[in-house]
Regions:
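Hydrophobic anchor at the beta1->P-loop junction of P-loop NTPases
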Residues: 6
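The conserved Walker
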Residues: 10
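Conserved glycine(s) of the Walker
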Residues: 13
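Conserved Walker
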Residues: 16
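Conserved substrate/cofactor phosphate-moiety recognition/catalytic segment
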Residues: 19, 23-63
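Glycine-rich phosphate-binding loop used to anchor ATP phosphates in small-molecule kinases
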Residues: 56-109
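A glycine- and Lys/Arg-enriched "phosphate-lid" helix/loop adjacent to the NTP-binding pocket
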Residues: 101-146
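NTP-dependent small-molecule kinase module
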Residues: 148-180
Length: 180
């Protein structure tokens, strides 16, 4: 089994996938977003941003991930790394695909209003609960557009894109079965 990089937009099922897969396997889970937030707070001069919207941080984190994945490649342990701050075009040359499977999660085919309803129904903590509906709709519209761009880039770089616009749990369970 290869190591796994899970990337994609916020609230696309990345963490849920990682938790489910780690529970069924011996993969160690590394959520990069905690490190991103720490770098933002502790080293502001690095220019790392941990906003929900992917920005120039993707290039910087891809360089960091290159070093991390190279170190992991020298171990016998298996890892799942997940991040909401990476674009396919930035990671493609920074990871050894012989040792890593890469999956991007997004929701390019759902309306912001429908995604908002899903979030309000299922998400009971975290940053979405601190946003009012109008704020969240604005963010979701941007994330839907980023999902579309990720999907396009994934096709270009032959990276698997998991569309979680609908049937999120089913899509996650299908991917886990495929990996196992």
């Amino acid at each position: 089994m290869k190591n796994i990089l899970i990337a994609g937009v916020a609230k696309s099922g990345k963490s849920l996938f990682c938790k489910k897969l780690a529970k069924k396997t011996n993969y160690n889970h590394i959520p990069i977003d905690y490190f991103t937030a720490s770098m933002k707070r502790n080293f502001p001069n690095w220019g790392i941003k941990s906003s929900v919207i992917i920005n120039d941080t993707s290039k910087k984190l891809s360089t960091l991930l290159n070093t991390v994945t190279n170190l992991i490649d020298d171990t016998d342990e298996k890892f799942i790394i997940d991040s909401a701050h990476i674009m396919p075009s930035d990671i493609i040359d920074n990871i050894n695909r012989d040792n890593w499977n890469i999956y991007f999660f997004g929701y390019p085919n759902i309306s912001a209003k429908d995604k908002l309803c899903e979030i309000r129904k299922y998400i009971k903590d975290g940053w979405p609960t601190k946003k009012d509906d109008n704020e969240l709709i604005t963010i979701l519209e941007k994330l839907i557009n980023i999902s579309k761009e990720m999907n396009t880039q994934c096709k270009k770089y032959n990276i698997k894109f998991i569309d979680t616009s609908f049937d999120l749990n089913k899509k996650i369970d299908e991917l886990i079965k495929k990996i196992l």
